[in-house]
């Protein structure tokens, strides 16, 4: 198998043997499966893929991704979830993209999703900046492992499935990469698809959604969080106009930003 690439899969209550087969893995993988036990074991698929499984009773997608990062031992890692199915040749496509640009630390790829879940589509090669990190999911990203470790970048335990606040751990990861001076690139190469399923965190544009988004925006944008909050409610207003007034949505985001400021201050005080 391609030892230069490893898929880091965050799973929840899955059968690792069935999962590895269903995902069409072409390279080695680490599966962190959140279950009711704590154990580790390895197996090899029928097409020769080496899979290292780590069952864990811990909860939270951030914990899962960090655990997978700790276990990884290849030059390049690809983040993944248990609802991703890869195209034939995806591994070669990823390795070729990194070979073509030795300066790229993180490369984002297309993963097809249903229209109502689409937040991005890469139609030309571009470099990701701080204003666009919120578009991309973690499962779109492959990274040079050594560079990520050298920069000390980890996934937040505050955001995402199983955490106190809703999604955002992937956006923070990419933002931390940029803040560390790493190069994040997006290429128009499709490597797989996401199978439809109910979201683990999105329950509509309710009060929690907007307040959590405010907390996230503080950690993403700092003193510019309020500006980004205004932009967010204006861009999204058509999606929630029948369930909440724009003024209330913005008020909730402001409350979230304030909560984020207080939380960041407490975290800084513990250092």
Model region roles, listed by residue range:
Residues 1-30:
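N-proximal low-complexity "stem/linker" segments adjacent to membrane-targeting elements
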Residues 77:
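Short aromatic/hydrophobic "clamp" motif used to bind/position activated sugar donors
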Residues 85-121:
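Conserved donor NDP-sugar-binding/catalytic core segment of glycosyltransferases
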Residues 160-172:
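Acidic donor-binding loop at a coil-to-helix junction in glycosyltransferase catalytic cores
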């Amino acid at each position: 198998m391609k030892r230069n690439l490893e898929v880091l899969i965050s799973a929840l209550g899955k059968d690792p043997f069935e999962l590895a087969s269903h995902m069409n893995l072409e390279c080695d993988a680490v599966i962190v499966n959140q279950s009711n036990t704590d154990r580790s074991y390895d197996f090899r698929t029928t097409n020769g893929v080496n899979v290292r499984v780590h069952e864990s009773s811990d909860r939270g997608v951030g914990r899962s991704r960090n655990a997978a990062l700790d276990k990884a031992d290849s030059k390049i890692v690809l983040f993944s979830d248990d609802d991703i199915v890869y195209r034939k040749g995806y591994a070669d496509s990823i390795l070729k993209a990194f070979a073509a640009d030795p300066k790229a630390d993180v490369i984002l790829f297309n993963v097809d999703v249903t229209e109502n879940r689409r937040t991005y589509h890469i139609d030309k090669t571009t470099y990701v900046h701080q204003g666009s990190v919120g578009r991309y999911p973690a499962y779109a990203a492959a990274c040079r492992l050594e560079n990520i470790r050298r920069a000390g970048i980890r996934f937040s335990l505050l955001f995402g499935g199983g955490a106190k606040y809703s999604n955002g751990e992937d956006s923070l990861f990419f933002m931390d990469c940029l803040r560390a001076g790493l190069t994040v690139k997006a290429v128009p190469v499709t490597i797989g698809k996401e199978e439809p399923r109910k979201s683990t965190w999105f329950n509509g544009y309710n009060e929690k959604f907007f307040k959590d988004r405010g907390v996230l925006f503080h950690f993403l944008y700092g003193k510019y969080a309020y500006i980004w909050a205004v932009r967010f409610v204006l861009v999204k207003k058509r999606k929630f106009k029948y369930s909440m007034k724009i003024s209330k949505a913005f008020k909730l985001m402001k409350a979230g930003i304030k909560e984020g400021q207080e939380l960041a201050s407490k975290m800084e005080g513990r250092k």
